[in-house]
């Protein structure tokens, strides 16, 4: 059981299911405290967080935050004073024919899968560098 206040802290986006959930579990097993985010499935994410806390004895915070929205990501980072690991896992896909996809849908996919990595990383790096200064 890892209840140390100075345990490493990891943030995982898109952590309510699939790869993000598996990454969160691996980090919890390794003793990391976690901040987990997702855009639409907060009840699922809260269940994941509760299970990880119970199973691994870590602190796990679930937050609704659309990684493609800079303001939502800024709210997540506003309460952090350090961060050791960032996992940019949030992602979506478009199911259908390319010829049926609108420009808006394409922009949403790009914003979620690519721009979100920029939004989170630009806020995470300064916190990560604090540990090394």
Where are these regions (language model features)?
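Conserved NAD(P)H cofactor-binding loop of Rossmann-fold oxidoreductase domains
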Residues: 90-94
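Active-site loop of short-chain dehydrogenase/reductase
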Residues: 7-8, 82-83, 128-133
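Conserved glycine-rich cofactor-binding loop
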Residues: 16-18
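Conserved glycine-rich Rossmann-like NAD(P)H-binding loop of the short-chain dehydrogenase/reductase
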Residues: 30-47
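A short, exposed helix-loop element centered on a Lys and neighboring polar residues
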Residues: 121-122
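Substrate-binding pocket helix/loop in short-chain dehydrogenase/reductase
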Residues: 97-98, 105-110
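The beta1-alpha1 cofactor-binding region of Rossmann-like NAD(H)/NADP(H)-dependent oxidoreductases
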Residues: 42, 63-75, 103
């Amino acid at each position: 059981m890892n209840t140390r206040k100075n345990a490493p802290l990891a943030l995982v986006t898109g952590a309510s299911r699939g790869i993000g959930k598996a990454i969160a579990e691996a980090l919890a097993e390794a003793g990391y405290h976690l901040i987990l985010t997702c855009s639409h499935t907060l009840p699922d994410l809260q269940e994941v967080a509760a299970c990880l806390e119970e199973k691994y004895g870590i602190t796990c915070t679930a937050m609704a935050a659309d990684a493609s929205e800079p303001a939502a990501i800024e709210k997540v980072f506003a309460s952090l004073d350090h961060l050791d690991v960032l996992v940019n896992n949030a992602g979506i896909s478009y199911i259908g024919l390319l010829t049926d996809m609108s420009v808006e849908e394409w922009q949403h996919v790009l914003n979620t899968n690519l721009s979100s990595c920029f939004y989170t990383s630009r806020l995470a790096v300064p916190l990560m560098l604090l540990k090394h200064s």
